[in-house]
Amino acid sequence: MKHNTKKLVLSGLFLAIGLVLPFLTGQIPEIGNMISPMHFPVLLCGFICGAPYGALVGLILPPVRFLLFQMPPLYPVGLAMAFEMATYGLVSGLVYSRVQHNIKGIYLSLVPAMVVGRIVWGIAQVILMGLSGGSFTFQAFIAGALINAVPAIVLQLILIPLIIAALHKAKILK
């Protein structure tokens, strides 16, 4: 299979996983917010397929999921998530393409992606809430990006490196 075709097929797979993975939380928004199941396939897509594919999957996943399952709500949550997850896929892919493919390199790619993605989410929330006449405070940002997201952050910091390292060890990734 040609390299670009493989990346396209894998991106479709990550999109599909992102569509169904939230069902593991029972569609309960509070649990979904804590675990962030849609973030995992986007981060993996950035690592495995590269920045453009990861960014595109991240950008289209929330709106497509809304169209199919009416979750997450498109405005402002889904749109802010789309920018956040596009950033996850973009940054993880860009940084990972420039570092050694070992555990240190995985973390050097994952942590900036998580930080920048959450900052982009906050900026998107400020803009989207401002457009609708609402407000998004710094306290809401801290709660949404950090405090409520601690379980997701911990899971991402554990599982993403394990998955990428296992794929390298199995020689599935080069």
Describe every region a protein language model picked out.
Residues M1-I48, P52-L56:
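Hydrophobic transmembrane alpha-helices
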Residues L10, F14-G18, V42, G46, ...:
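Alpha-helical transmembrane segments in multi-pass membrane proteins
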Residues Q27-G32, Q70-L79, V99-K174:
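Membrane-embedded alpha-helical hairpins and interfacial helices in multi-pass inner-membrane proteins
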Residues F40-L43, P62, F66, M85, ...:
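Hydrophobic transmembrane alpha-helices of multi-pass small-molecule transporters
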Residues G54, G58, I127-G130:
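A cytosolic-side transmembrane-helix exit/cap motif
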